[in-house]
A protein has these predicted regions:
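Extracytoplasmic
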Residues: 66-70, 103-105, 150, 181
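A short acidic-to-branched-hydrophobic micro-motif
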Residues: 92-122
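Signature of long, low-cysteine stretches enriched in small and polar/charged residues
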Residues: 124-174
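Short, well-ordered beta-strand elements
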Residues: 106, 181-191
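Solvent-exposed loop/turn segments at secondary-structure junctions
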Residues: 114-115, 146, 159-162, 190-194
Length: 214
C-alpha cells in the first residue's frame, strides 16, 4: 500500500537524520613513495545530532496539536495529500508519475524544540548536514537566505538510495515562539531521471511553502 510505504520512509527519515556519507575531494598527493593511511573524513553533525548534543528536546508536532505554528503546502495538479502520517506533519505524492518503483513525494515535519538555542547558528552550521550526509550526495544549489523572515537553509542535490539516483530539494526553517522554537523541515523528492519533467511541480511546491503563527 502506497501510504504505508511512505509512512515507513517518514519514520526512517526522522529516526535516521544524518545517516550516510560525504566524500570531499582528496588533497594533492605527496612526493613520498610510501602510502599514508588516512581516516575517512568526518561527517558534519546532523541537525538532530546537534540539537540532542546541546540538550534541546525534539518533539514532532501534528496538525491537530495546539502548537502556535502551522505549515501549509498547496499541491499541484495530480498530487495527493496523504495527511499526517506520524511523525510527519504532512505527506503528499504524485502516483501517476511513478518511476523505478517510486512516486514523487513531498514531506513536511514540524518539530517543537525545547531549550535555549541560537536559531541562526543552528541553521548556518547544520542546515545542510542532513542532505550532505546522504550517500554520494552531489550539490546543485544552496542558500542561507531567510524564509518569511526566519533563519533558513535550502539545498538541492542528488544522492543514491537503494540503487536509484534521487533528486531532492530540502528546506529547514526555525521559527521562534516565546521560549520555544519550531523547526520546519520540508523535502520534495523525485528520481533524477524525472526531475526535469517535474520541475514545474517542484517549483510550485517549494515556492508555495507557507509558515504561519497563531
Amino acid at each position: 500500500m502506497r501510504s504505508a510505504a511512505l509512512a515507513a520512509v517518514a519514520v526512517a527519515a526522522f529516526a535516521m537524520i544524518g545517516c550516510g556519507s560525504q566524500n570531499p575531494g582528496q588533497p594533492a598527493g605527496s612526493a613520498s613513495g610510501t602510502p599514508e593511511s588516512t581516516a575517512p573524513p568526518a561527517k558534519p553533525a546532523s541537525m538532530n545530532e546537534y540539537l540532542h548534543s546541546v540538550g534541546v528536546t525534539v518533539t514532532p508536532v501534528s496538525p491537530e496539536s495546539p502548537a502556535n505554528v502551522r505549515v501549509d503546502v498547496p499541491l499541484p495538479r495530480g498530487w495527493e495529500n496523504l495527511g499526517a502520517l506520524d511523525p510527519a506533519y504532512l505527506i503528499a505524492d504524485k502516483p501517476s508519475d511513478a518511476d523505478q518503483g517510486r512516486t514523487p513525494s513531498a514531506v513536511v515535519y514540524l518539530i517543537k524544540l525545547g531549550g535555549p538555542l541560537d536559531a541562526r547558528k543552528v541553521i548556518s552550521e547544520h542546515g545542510f548536514a542532513d542532505a550532505q550526509n546522504t550517500q554520494n550526495f552531489r550539490k546543485i544549489a544552496s542558500s542561507l537566505d531567510d524564509y518569511q523572515g526566519y533563519p533558513s537553509a535550502a539545498i538541492e542535490g542528488t544522492y543514491e538510495n537503494q540503487g536509484v539516483r534521487v533528486h531532492a530539494w530540502s528546506r529547514d526553517v526555525i521559527v521562534p515562539d516565546g521560549p520555544l522554537h519550531y523547526l520546519v523541515q520540508f523535502t520534495v523528492t523525485t528520481t533524477e531521471a524525472q526531475s526535469a519533467a517535474l520541475s514545474q511541480d517542484v517549483a510550485a511546491l517549494t515556492g508555495g511553502l507557507k509558515i504561519t503563527k497563531r
